């Protein structure tokens, strides 16, 4: 619907994915830490087979990984009781979720998501933030379409960094546990950058189930 040729689309997507690869190179927990350029990502080869034209392996989620992550959530009172230093605290400000129809054939089109638009914008509204106020963003990145649709619905530029892990291709795609990794990495970055704001998105199904969270070392002004 954007009027691109296949070659133009491949170039755009591979450039975006090269940016994800650069982030993975800086993430000590990423699965593929070799920084790959756009040409390497879009060119099929022995280690980059064509999965579903025009998307080779390096444009798809990588679930051949051995990864685990965990977070600890507790009240302020419990954190103090346990002696957790406040420099390690990261507050969840907002959480929202929404659901598109399961049946892909019943959707108005294949390039939009009302659920992302409604729940994502509601999360930012509840947090009192706009997209330009977000210092770190991780958009669920199983495939390029997921990032492009979410960015369009949320008003996020594809020119900014849209991952903190390197995404499901390079950071690693441990099936349903990926967002635990993106939240964990977001916590690390926010601890290193007190006062900054982070935004994490999640997805399940065929771009069907969506969830959003805003995080910061600063306490939220209202209740979670």
Stretches with model-predicted labels:
Residues 171-172, 176-224:
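C-terminal catalytic subdomain
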Residues 1-78, 84-170, 188, 216-224:
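Conserved "HGTGT" condensation-loop signature of ketosynthase/thiolase-family condensing enzymes
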């Amino acid at each position: 619907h954007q009027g691109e040729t296949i070659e133009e689309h491949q170039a755009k997507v591979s450039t975006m994915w090269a940016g994800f690869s650069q982030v993975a190179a800086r993430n000590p927990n990423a699965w593929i830490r070799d920084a790959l350029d756009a040409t390497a990502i879009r060119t099929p080869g022995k280690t980059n087979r064509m999965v579903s034209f025009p998307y080779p392996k390096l444009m798809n989620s990588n679930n051949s990984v051995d990864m685990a992550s965990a977070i600890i959530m507790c009240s302020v009172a419990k954190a103090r009781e346990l002696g957790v230093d406040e420099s390690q605290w990261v507050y969840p400000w907002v959480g929202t979720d929404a659901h598109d129809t399961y049946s892909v054939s019943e959707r108005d089109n294949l390039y939009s998501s009302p659920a992302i638009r409604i729940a994502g914008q509601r999360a930012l509204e509840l947090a009192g933030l706009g997209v330009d106020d977000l210092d770190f963003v991780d958009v669920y990145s199983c495939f390029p379409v997921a990032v492009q649709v979410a960015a369009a619905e949320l008003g996020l530029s594809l020119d900014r960094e849209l991952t903190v892990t390197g995404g499901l291709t390079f950071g690693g795609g441990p099936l349903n546990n990926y967002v635990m990794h993106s939240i964990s990495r977001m916590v690390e970055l926010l601890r290193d950058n007190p006062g900054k704001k982070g935004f994490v998105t999640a997805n399940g199904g065929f771009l069907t189930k969506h969830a959003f969270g805003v995080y910061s070392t600063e306490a939220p002004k209202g209740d979670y």
